[in-house]
Regions:
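Sec-dependent signal peptide hydrophobic core
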Residues: 5-12
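Short, flexible, surface-exposed loop segments at domain boundaries
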Residues: 2-5, 20-56, 60-196
Length: 196
């Protein structure tokens, strides 16, 4: 029975429809404080934010993921930006659950970036860059994945992983007090940082 919360943690974190991402307010930074109920984050621009953590909120830790782990038929979440010629270039690659809703939508990792949840149908290596062919229910997209593109994998974690100074990604919603309540958390671990 102890495995159930851990499995739910990964499924809740990974099975996100791209549409739902647009409804969240995402925060990226390092943990500045944590009292068991409220997480303080120093954001990348130096500002601070405090986020309520509801009881029972699953925590995901971060595990290393590399091109050697990528397999055809795997469902990936790939964040991209467009070059001037329209070519899509990956800035983040992560495996997600096979049951995750597939599609493409805007994402806030970088200005004008998009996220695609899709099945990897083909990959071609040219020099030090891979080209992914990603298929989802209503379309297909080709993405260049240069060597060194950030990659990571979400794995079950716990509140014990919420240590000061650790990198963290939090998806939140506005609450009735005009503050923020976390709906997902992924925290760095063993030197591996969230890439989304």
């Amino acid at each position: 029975m102890k495995l159930i919360p851990k499995l739910l943690c990964v499924l809740v974190f990974c099975c996100l429809a791209p549409m739902s991402l647009a409804q969240n307010i995402n925060w990226r930074g390092t943990i500045a404080s944590y009292d068991g109920k409220v997480l303080g984050i120093t954001l990348r621009d130096g500002q601070s934010v405090w986020i309520d953590l509801p009881e029972g909120l699953p925590i995901s830790a971060t595990e290393r993921f590399s091109m050697e782990d990528v397999k055809l038929g795997m469902v990936l979440g790939v964040t991209t930006v467009n070059r001037a010629d329209g070519t899509k270039v990956a800035i983040d690659v992560r495996p997600i659950s096979p049951t995750a809703p597939q599609g493409l939508s805007a994402y806030d990792l970088q200005p004008q970036s998009t996220m695609t949840n899709a099945v990897l149908e083909a990959t071609v290596l040219s020099s030090d860059t891979h080209e992914f062919v990603l298929n989802y229910k209503t379309g297909s997209v080709k993405v260049l994945v240069p060597k060194g593109t950030p990659m990571s994998r979400a794995v079950p974690g716990s509140r014990a992983d919420l240590v000061l100074g650790q990198s963290v990604y939090v998806a939140s919603r506005r609450n009735d007090a005009n503050g923020y309540t976390a709906v997902r958390i992924q925290v760095g671990k063993n030197g591996v940082h969230p890439t989304q």
